Regions:
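Conserved ATP-binding/catalytic core of the eukaryotic-like protein kinase fold
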Residues: 1-241
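Positively charged, low-complexity intrinsically disordered regions
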Residues: 95, 100, 149, 344, ...
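C-terminal lobe helix-coil module of Hanks-type protein kinase domains
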Residues: 153-156, 190-338, 342-356
């Protein structure tokens, strides 16, 4: 019998990711009349709970992300605090991040993933990004959201074949630009756009360059901008001529070469203007290559790739079943009252590092 840890109205089960500033748990929430829901609960680590700047960023993440309701973006349910410990409750995705999938597929077969599948995944990400980029406030004014950290760790694929963008932690709405000190680099170096490196004002095209890097790496099975140091990596992004993906993987068709290189144009004016433009080209390629790749195909691929992991996850979930069965029968016997402090909860949690499907952003 495994016992979860009470935390406010939630029961924390396995810790599914931990970074330098926050940790993410699989958690369960209960309501009246048998209502219950699994969530991913992202909580600031106790040692930085007093860091006002990070707390502001954490709150900004929730405020931006809660405005977004789209099939290809992880849904935020709640921002709150328990005993001064801030947390965000969000949609729980049973699946893997793109980095883990990429590494597993490469180890399994040693060959790059099918270009059709990659085009399908990137097209779904384009849909989510386009929605975020075009989001307007209640008065109908564009909010100007730029994700700023589009990378394989921030893209999840569920075992059902759903593709989701996570972690708007470094996203900034343009009307909040006063919060951003000019020239501060945020995001992962190897996935930054040239204008991001230079500390220039960003628009949606910066995210498309970052997505272009992800696209290229999936197509070739190799990292694109990896230098001997962070400085070298940034120099590569600014100066390196990028050969077409087909030069590294002959399976990549010409149409995909063109889409990939257009997203990676150093000059923003030569890049796709909107994610919807890139999506249109990807869809045209997919529809002209029958049989069309579907969500079911993606689900099948993922379930095959992570068959053993899925079985282990089922066992972990089953270990909590007796506790939750008892709780459902007799809720009064489980009054949470003395919620353990966030530090105690952290120390007592089993740390499951079997996957990192909810990323830590700046952690």
């Amino acid at each position: 019998l495994k016992k979860p840890i009470p935390f406010g109205e939630y029961y924390l089960m396995d810790r599914i990711a931990v970074g330098g500033m926050a940790e993410v748990f699989k958690a369960k929430a209960f309501g009246s009349d048998g209502f219950e829901k699994d969530v991913a609960l992202k909580r600031i680590l106790p040692n930085i709970a007093e860091d006002a700047e990070f707390i502001d960023m954490f709150i900004d993440e929730a405020k931006i992300a809660v405005k977004l309701s789209h099939a290809n973006i992880v849904q935020i349910f709640k921002l709150d605090q328990v005993e001064g410990s801030y947390f965000i409750a969000m949609e729980y995705i049973q699946g893997r991040d793109l980095r883990t999938i990429f590494d597993r597929a490469r180890r399994k077969d040693g060959i790059p993933i099918d270009p059709k599948m990659i085009a399908y995944v990137i097209a779904r990400i384009c849909e989510g990004l386009d929605y975020a980029h075009r989001k307007r406030d209640e008065q109908g004014n564009p909010i100007g959201i730029v994700h700023r950290d589009v990378s394989p760790q921030n893209i999840l694929i569920s075992y059902e074949g759903d593709v989701k963008i996570i972690d708007f932690g470094v996203a900034k709405a343009q009307n909040k630009m006063s919060r951003t000190q000019a020239g501060i680099l945020k995001g992962k170096f190897a996935y930054m756009s040239p204008e991001q490196i230079q500390g220039l004002q960003l628009d949606q095209r910066s995210d498309l360059f970052s997505l272009g890097i992800v696209f290229y790496e999936l197509l070739t099975g190799q990292r694109l901008f990896v230098g001997e140091s962070d400085f070298h990596t940034l120099e590569m992004i600014r100066n390196m001529d990028v050969p077409p993906p087909s030069s590294k993987n002959p399976q990549v068709p010409k149409a995909i070469d063109e889409i990939s290189l257009k997203a990676l144009a150093r000059n923003v004016d030569q890049r796709y203007t909107y994610a919807s433009d890139m999506h249109e080209d990807l869809q045209r390629y997919l529809y002209s290559n029958q049989p069309i790749f579907t969500r079911q195909n993606l689900s099948q691929f993922l379930r095959e790739c992570f068959k053993e992991d899925l079985e282990k996850e089922k066992l972990r979930t089953a270990a909590y079943k007796p506790f939750f069965d008892e709780l459902r029968k007799n809720p009064a016997a489980f009054e949470q009252g003395d919620t353990p402090s966030s530090q105690a909860a952290s120390m007592n949690m089993p740390q499951q590092q079997f996957h990192q499907h909810h990323n830590m952003g700046s952690g």
